């Protein structure tokens, strides 16, 4: 992104102002209450991660206050790890300590679990995704890039999940040619839940009333391109839809910004519906919470992962919905327990899914981080030695272990 511009950001509202300058912040979190600091803390990924990647590469500079009062002013490209895998860090008493970066292998999939480590990395990359455990970020400089001249939101409908996955794989292979920025999946049970929401709430549901009766599942797309390439990109997309058994005539599409936002809300209405469903159950079972997975698998393993999810959930007799960032091979399985026994079973399945996904080379925490509830998964992914190396990084930046108690590490 040679034309990228730097921008000091204190809030996502400030980032929103970039749109008037034909610029945008590519991580583009889908949660409207997100903050820039929050997105940096967990290396957030929005729907547009498919094309642009997560938060980390768009963080150009950080000012960080460490737990012992030291202040670091870090800049990408200036403060980097030496080829030896080491860097110098000033200590509180004015000395310098040699710090070695971890040697574990970072997943090639989306991943927000643990401290990033890679050869030639920038020191600020430790803080992006560290969940507040290494320092308090007080200032952030992010990169914005030119916004596409033309944008279109499209919802495609499919009569089988197999069609939808095959369509997605074709888009993944031709992402540059087709100018697709986001690919979001709404599975069969999820689409049924949205239909029920429309029936109950009508026009206030955020779900259009013209859902095709034959639709088994849906895929939401964002297309962004130059003005000159726009018509050609949409024509090619229509061809790909037809090639996979879909019908462009049943698709929804929107070009104007307000209409695009309406289609985006169609996808975002789903987690709102799930949360409302769980809230209703909690009236009689207050110990229940939603169990939402956050796992990504390598390319070519998505069908296998979906099969594992569905088979285990069916065998356990649990209710669930599947949706999410299918373009990144990153689907959210939301398990919907009806009582405490099902909740315990759901947690057991959650751990089984994590083991299976890591065995494929994927991540059990693709975008939401580890937090305080999933510390077991950090060890599942990086094993005892990897966690030990992370604790050494933690000790270098936070020697008194004052920050983020219980986060990442049990």
Regions found by a protein language model. Give the residues of each.
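FAD-binding subdomain of flavoenzyme oxidoreductases
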Residues: 1-171, 177
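Short coil/turn segments at secondary-structure boundaries
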Residues: 30, 254, 369, 405-408
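Short low-complexity, flexible loop/linker segments enriched in glycine and/or proline
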Residues: 39-42, 198-199, 336-337, 379-382
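C-terminal substrate-recognition/cap domain of FAD-linked oxidoreductases
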Residues: 128-130, 136-347, 352, 356, ...
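Alpha-helix capping/hinge segments and adjacent helical runs
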Residues: 360-370, 399-403
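Activity-critical C-terminal alpha-helical subdomain
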Residues: 375-410
């Amino acid at each position: 992104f040679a034309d990228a511009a730097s921008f000091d950001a204190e809030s996502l509202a400030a980032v929103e102002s970039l749109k008037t300058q034909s610029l945008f912040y590519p991580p583009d979190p889908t949660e409207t209450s997100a903050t820039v600091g929050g997105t940096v803390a967990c290396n957030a990924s929005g729907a547009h991660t498919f094309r642009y990647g997560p938060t980390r590469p768009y963080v150009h500079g950080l000012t960080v206050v460490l737990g012992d009062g030291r202040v670091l002013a870090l800049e990408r490209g200036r403060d980097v790890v030496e080829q030896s895998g080491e860097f110098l860090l000033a200590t509180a008493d004015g000395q310098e300590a040699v710090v070695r970066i971890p040697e574990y292998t970072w997943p090639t999939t989306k991943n927000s679990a643990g401290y990033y480590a890679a050869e030639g990395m920038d020191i600020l990359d430790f803080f992006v995704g560290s969940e507040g455990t290494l320092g308090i970020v007080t200032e952030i400089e992010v990169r914005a890039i030119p916004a596409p001249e033309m944008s279109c939101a499209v919802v495609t409908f499919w009569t089988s999940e197999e069609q939808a996955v095959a369509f997605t794989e074709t888009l993944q292979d031709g992402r540059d040619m087709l100018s697709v920025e986001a690919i979001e999946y709404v599975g069969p049970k999820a689409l049924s839940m949205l239909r029920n929401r429309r029936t109950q709430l009508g026009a206030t549901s955020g779900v259009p009333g013209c859902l095709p009766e034959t639709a088994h599942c849906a895929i939401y797309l964002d297309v962004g391109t130059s003005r000159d390439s726009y018509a050609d990109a949409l024509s090619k997309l229509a061809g790909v839809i037809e090639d996979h058994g879909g019908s462009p005539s049943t698709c929804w599409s929107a070009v104007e910004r307000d209409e695009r936002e309406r289609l985006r809300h169609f996808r975002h209405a789903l987690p709102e519906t799930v949360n409302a469903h769980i809230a209703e159950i909690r009236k009689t079972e207050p110990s229940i919470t939603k169990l939402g997975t956050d796992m990504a698998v390598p390319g070519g393993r998505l069908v296998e992962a979906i099969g594992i999810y569905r088979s285990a959930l069916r065998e356990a007799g649990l209710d669930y919905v599947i949706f999410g960032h299918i373009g990144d091979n990153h689907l959210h399985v939301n398990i919907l327990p009806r009582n405490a026994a099902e909740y315990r079973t759901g947690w057991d399945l959650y751990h089984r899914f994590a083991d299976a996904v890591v065995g494929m080379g994927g991540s059990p925490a693709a975008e939401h981080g580890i937090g305080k509830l999933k510390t077991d998964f950090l060890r599942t992914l990086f094993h005892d030695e990897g966690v030990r190396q992370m604790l050494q990084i933690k000790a270098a930046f936070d020697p008194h272990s004052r920050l983020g108690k219980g986060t990442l590490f049990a």
